[in-house]
Curated annotation (Swiss-Prot):
It comes from Polynucleobacter asymbioticus (strain DSM 18221 / CIP 109841 / QLW-P1DMWA-1). GO terms for molecular function: structural constituent of ribosome. GO terms for biological process: translation. It comes from the Bacteria. Belongs to the bacterial ribosomal protein bL28 family. The lineage of its organism: Bacteria, Pseudomonadati, Pseudomonadota, Betaproteobacteria, Burkholderiales. GO terms for cellular component: cytosolic large ribosomal subunit. Keywords: Ribonucleoprotein, Ribosomal protein. NCBIfam families: L28. This is Large ribosomal subunit protein bL28.
């Protein structure tokens, strides 16, 4: 399963580990993904989403129905 937020689209980033001696080695910065279930009152069922903490804040701000309609318009669900 891809490490991508279904709401915000955040993906892993690539960067460097930097030691005290300034040696650099490649690393990945992973998004803070959480599996969450949301009760959708209009559909009378649970929806499972894999999203980041930022995605949770978007749902808190806009509501689950608005976010789901946006996801369906993009073809995510």
């Amino acid at each position: 399963m891809a490490k991508v937020c279904q709401v915000t689209g955040k993906k892993p980033m690539v960067g460097n580990n930097v030691s005290h001696a300034n040696n650099k080695t490649k690393r990945r910065f992973l998004p803070n993904l959480q599996n969450r279930r949301f009760w959708v009152e209009s559909e009378n069922r649970w929806i499972s989403l894999r999203l980041t903490n930022a995605g949770l804040r978007v749902i808190d701000k806009n509501g689950i129905d608005a976010v789901l309609s946006d996801l369906r318009a993009r073809g995510e669900i």
